[in-house]
Swiss-Prot record:
InterPro entries reported in the protein's UniProt record: KduI, KduI/IolB_isomerase, KduI_N, RmlC-like_jellyroll, RmlC_Cupin_sf
Record NCBIfam families: PRK00924.1
Record text on cofactor binding: Binds 1 zinc ion per subunit.
Residues bound to Zn(2+): H196, H198, E203, H245
Protein name: 4-deoxy-L-threo-5-hexosulose-uronate ketol-isomerase
The keyword Metal-binding appears for this protein: yes
HAMAP family, per database record: KduI
Gene: kduI
Length: 278
């Protein structure tokens, strides 16, 4: 488990490229036949990926010990979106087939969660966010047909995109975790611009569906002290509440967003005009 401490905005603005990477960048999300796990002190979110190929993968009791509990989800809820080939997730003996861009919400208290790929030639890639939970909501599969989509932006401003809301109150109940997938229309490059912060929630972006020769310049920092982190395919970035989170790519791309914090009101954000950015 890679533990990331919270960081004050005054400290963050003094960091060089490597310093920003050390604090915010999750460079390697998928490793064959393993799980990756980054634990952030910011709202106690856990972020990672699971890519089973030749064997099943489960999160063992060693993680429970690191969290001070008996097992991983004793006091946590889990959201998973599959960006790879078809796979299965078995939760306490109940098997769910999770296809490409299907998702699974796993409620607090699930003791055994096992991940597998159906075809080793096209393995599943399970990206997950995990957050503290106060009660148990039912485990539920969500397919792309069941999400709450919203299309925003315009081709003229190169920010036309569809926001697919997977884990939001309109789709299912969770304790605090919200997740979704945003896909840019062909030829569009900007996400979340004009940008915003949200004092009451933190957020993690996971960028994928990018060519090897493409990248995204992820904008972060306070609106008057912006910085950037260069993101490559299948990398994630942590965004504290005080930071903007926006990006521009050399080509169109897709990203998964996950939020935890005070509320689940999607529009609870503090907008920042482009003219006010520095």
């Amino acid at each position: 488990m890679d533990v990331r401490q919270s960081i004050h905005s005054a400290h963050a603005k003094t960091l060089d490229t490597q310093g920003l990477h050390n604090e915010f960048l999750v460079e390697k999300v998928f490793v064959a036949d393993e799980y990756t796990m980054v634990y952030s002190h910011i709202d106690r979110i856990i972020v990672g990926g699971i890519m089973p190929i030749t064997k099943t993968v489960s999160v063992g009791g060693e993680v429970g010990k690191q969290l001070g509990v008996s097992y991983f989800l004793e006091r946590r809820e889990l959201g998973v979106i599959n960006i790879g080939g078809a796979g299965t997730i078995t939760v306490d003996g109940q098997c769910y087939e999770i296809g490409h861009r299907d998702a699974l919400y796993v409620g607090k208290g699930a003791k055994e969660v096992v991940f597998a790929s159906i075809d080793t030639a096209t393995p599943a890639k399970f990206y997950y966010n995990c957050a503290p939970a106060h009660t148990t909501y039912p485990t539920k599969k969500v397919t792309p047909d069941e999400v709450s989509p919203v299309t925003l932006g315009d081709n003229l401003t190169s920010n036309r995109r569809t926001i697919n809301k997977y884990f939001v109150p309109d789709v299912l109940e969770t304790c605090q975790l919200s997740m979704g997938l945003t896909e840019l229309a062909p030829g569009n490059l900007w996400n979340t611009m004009p940008c915003h912060t949200h004092e009451r929630r933190m957020e993690v972006y996971f960028y994928f569906n990018m060519d090897d020769d493409a990248c995204v310049f992820h904008m972060m920092g306070q609106p008057q002290e912006t910085r950037h982190i260069v993101m490559h395919n299948e990398q994630a970035v942590i965004s504290p509440s005080w930071s903007i989170h926006s990006g521009v790519g050399t080509k169109a791309y897709t990203f998964i967003w996950g939020m935890v914090g005070e509320n689940q009101v999607f529009d609870d954000m503090d907008h920042v005009a482009v003219k006010d950015l520095r």
